[in-house]
């Protein structure tokens, strides 16, 4: 039987999809990416923005149209939050929540076409107190060189704009022992790089007994003497301190790259969002990192058009990014999420103004990326070869630059490369054979 799995959204979603694919393959199912040839199509949905909702619905409708005979399954965060709305789409057979997602391996033999969607959703995920375990994936199943490892799920922050705690539940963590076991499994699979991911990494370990911090977990991983690169996914500025930054100095395996969920450069907007840090805290982190490590990659998330965001508030964000040595930005247009505090706020920013501000920030993002690439020209970096693209080998450096080479290389090898010139979305390089 052929199963196609499609993923929308974050690295946690991707990790869970990869895990399911590996479990299915071990049970004898074939994992494909062709809708027309699939017997079962699973969409792991996202609901972080209005656009993610739309993309989830569009993909489900596309599957139903292209292959009406296939069993269509919607799971993930949008399925968790909007199961009643999804149930109105004719052709969806099953709507499965985040808690129930892990049970898909047991449900598969019993799935069949339905006249009406069957809904399997825990109605109140905020009551979940244990981590739903998804085992790490096999490299021959996902055919990727970079492995994700979900070590944490859920969030207790309840920021005013964010629906994620309602879709993912409260913060829960994988035990340090399980984390270490999974890391060795992935290393033995042949992965050369591991990305720690979670809904709120900084909350890792607070729910465990005894509690353990994310920093303490990283130190424990460091002591294992692993032979693979470690990369971190998004971090909250409030959880990055001196000891955390110091770890990058003492651990060569830890990639010099952080993605910081800033969201706004306006103190007023940060307070309305319920974010637990100041602009000065963000500045302190960025300047300290760049002082210690001049080629450190720093990415930021920005939400544009939060209710009440004035032109002055926006310019505070724009000028902060312009002045700080930020490497790149991920820019999101604000959209109301049902049930959140900000959805009830007045002073909504008109869509045309949001679009104008997004356009300005995206141009600034292009400038920031170009400047970061320029600073790295002539350097030698360690590139993990990930794929072949139009005759080029493509991979990422330790500081997250997309690097292209014409020379023949093997996928899943780390190669020393000299960066030469701008190229596509990254930099053109040549293998460095000197000392």
Give the positions of each predicted feature.
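Short flexible coil/turn linkers enriched for glycine and charged/polar residues
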Residues: 142-145, 155-156, 254, 264, ...
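Hydrophobic, well-ordered secondary-structure elements that form the walls
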Residues: 260, 301, 321, 329, ...
